[in-house]
Design a protein with these regions (language model features):
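Charged, amphipathic alpha-helical stretches
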Residues: 3-57
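Extended alpha-helical scaffold segments
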Residues: 22-26, 37, 41-42, 54-62, ...
Length: 544
């Protein structure tokens, strides 16, 4: 301490820079205790920021930072600080050198952490973290720097979770073999839409879909934790203003982090057009915005207020229904994937009781409220309208879940008849087609079946399936309330007699009249117990 007493304020500042440059930060606390005014906390942090090499292991100086920030008195030193580098400098020379130091500011450029309430230590740590990343690329050192401090600052904790955690997972855990690592500056420069696209597009194409789920939970989830940061809000707002098509969800995106999660829903919908299996896997294995992994730095179940969590959960469920409607693939695999999606959505939103299921050999009798569904226009099925919160087809309700699952069961039934169409096409037939169009589509189904007809075809089952497709009923009621059955079934505008007629015409085309008569005489006709509407059929001049 004796050597320090002979130093001026200028000498003390220069000595502090020397200690930092040599990595000997242990003496800074002792030096500050001798010059508390000259080496106040802000100036000392700026000296450390400017002169301490970024490659220095944080464990060597984090305890000093804590002591300086807390104002802890320096312990009695075991040995005096070496003042020889500065003690012989004339005062004028020392002052001149101090004026030329050009200390870095505590606040990182373009950083929003300086909001008037952020303490100097937090500003220092954020700036120091960026310098470590820029100069060394060792983001693990940044984690070592922040771990002792993140719990004392909400700003710092948010920054660690939303910026550093996704980068550590991306660069070191999930994709360590990538040629280029992503920097903090690059990630922080992204708006919500770009970040979601980059982080989710990292998923490697493969046989399973765990990569996408992992990225949703472990990359996008933490990123969204920082949606309230001023810089993020500014970037995302500017991106929305510059976008040709504005968000369908502007009412909520400006006041919560729903804007970012809306981009996730948009990405899933868009991605499903080219990689349906992977998106199906996401809905089957990820439970939406509340299903995130924040690395233990924050309790996941406390990140979203109740109302906001429920809203985001519903919007995610809507994205699931939208994905099903938008899927153009008519394969059996895609259809089974659609069943997976709607089942997962119904389970997540506690709407499972409204799913249409087959529990026995017969197709179920269905009846549910269609008022909101029947009022939709063709525009409701356009891709840019599927995520609109007010869309009755995709907004998750008991009606929308029942209707869509009925459509999917209809598609499965059509597939068994050899006629495959998309979910969107089925919805249009049911909701927006005239009686002529529905009849034409029915004939297409029958013709397809007849064209590929087999001798052993079970016509009784075929008839039951087509009649069920008409009105989603297993058996005809004693008295049918036409109004209550509107929009129930793909061919609800076509009369039951016409459906019966079309089935019989197809059967005759496949089996031939002579075979039918022969089997009738022999008593082996498999259709002998079917109550055909013969009078109506004769009136149509199909039989003599």
């Amino acid at each position: 301490m004796a050597g320090l007493e002979r130093l001026s304020a200028a000498h003390a500042i220069l000595l502090a820079t020397q200690l930092c440059a040599s990595g000997n930060v242990a003496g800074l606390q002792q030096l500050q205790s001798r010059f508390p005014t000259t080496l106040n906390l802000e100036r000392l942090l700026r000296i450390i920021l400017t002169f301490l090499p970024e490659s220095t292991e944080p464990q060597r100086y984090t305890s000093v930072l804590q002591a300086l920030a807390d104002g802890t008195p320096a312990e009695s030193p075991g040995e005096d600080i070496d003042v020889s580098p500065v003690q012989n400098l004339p005062e004028a020379v020392a002052r001149k050198r101090v004026r030329k130091l050009h200390l870095l500011p505590l606040r990182y450029r373009d950083g929003e952490e300086d909001d008037g309430s952020t303490d100097p230590l937090t500003q220092f740590l954020v700036h120091r973290a960026h310098r470590i990343d820029t100069e060394t690329g060792l983001q693990t050192l940044v984690l070592d720097l922040l771990l002792p401090f993140y719990q004392r600052s909400e700003t710092l904790r948010t920054w660690l979770i939303s910026v550093l955690l996704p980068l550590l997972r991306l660069n070191y855990e999930y994709y360590p073999n990538r040629e280029e690592t992503m920097s903090m500056e690059v990630l922080e420069s992204m708006d919500d839409k770009r970040a979601v696209n980059v982080l989710l597009s990292m998923a490697n194409p493969g046989k399973d879909n765990t990569d996408l789920v992992k990225n949703l939970r472990g990359l996008v989830g933490p990123w969204m934790y920082g949606s309230g940061r001023p810089k993020r809000r500014k970037l995302s707002l500017a991106a929305r203003r510059n976008s040709i098509s504005t968000s369908q969800d502007d009412t909520i995106s400006h006041r919560t982090n729903a804007s970012g999660w809306h981009e996730v829903n948009e990405w899933l919908l868009s991605r499903s057009q080219v990689d349906y299996d992977r998106v199906v896997g996401a809905f089957a294995n990820w439970n939406g915005p509340e299903d995130v992994d924040l690395g233990g730095y924050e309790k996941e179940n406390e990140t979203l207020p109740g109302d906001e969590g429920a809203t985001l959960r519903k919007r995610y469920g809507q994205a699931g229904l939208a994905v099903v409607y938008a899927n153009p693939d008519t394969s059996k695999r895609a259809l089974e994937g659609s069943f997976q999606v709607i089942s997962s959505v119904a389970k997540l939103l506690e709407l499972e009781e409204h799913l249409v299921t087959v529990t026995g050999p017969s197709l179920p009798d269905l009846s549910f409220d269609m008022d909101s569904i029947s009022s939709t226009s063709k525009a409701s099925l356009l891709q840019n309208a599927l995520l609109t919160p007010s869309n009755p087809l995709t907004s998750p309700t008991s009606q929308s879940v029942s209707f869509l699952s009925a459509l999917l069961l209809s598609l499965r039934t059509l597939g068994e008849l050899g006629h495959s169409i998309s979910c969107k096409a089925a919805a249009n037939i049911c909701l927006h087609s005239s009686d002529e169009t529905q009849l034409l589509e029915l004939r297409n189904v029958v013709e397809t079946m007849a064209k590929h007809g087999r001798t052993g075809l079970d016509w009784r089952k075929v008839r039951e399936q087509l009649l069920w497709l008409r009105d989603w009923r297993g058996k005809p009621p004693a008295e049918e309330n036409v109004q209550s059955r509107e929009y129930h079934g793909l061919f609800w505008r076509v009369s039951r007699d016409v459906v019966e007629t079309e089935v019989l015409k197809a059967m005759l085309a496949v089996r031939g009249m002579s075979i039918l008569q022969k089997e009738n005489c022999a008593g082996t006709n498999p259709l002998q117990n079917i109550n055909w509407p013969w009078t109506s059929i004769r009136n149509r001049k199909l039989l003599p």
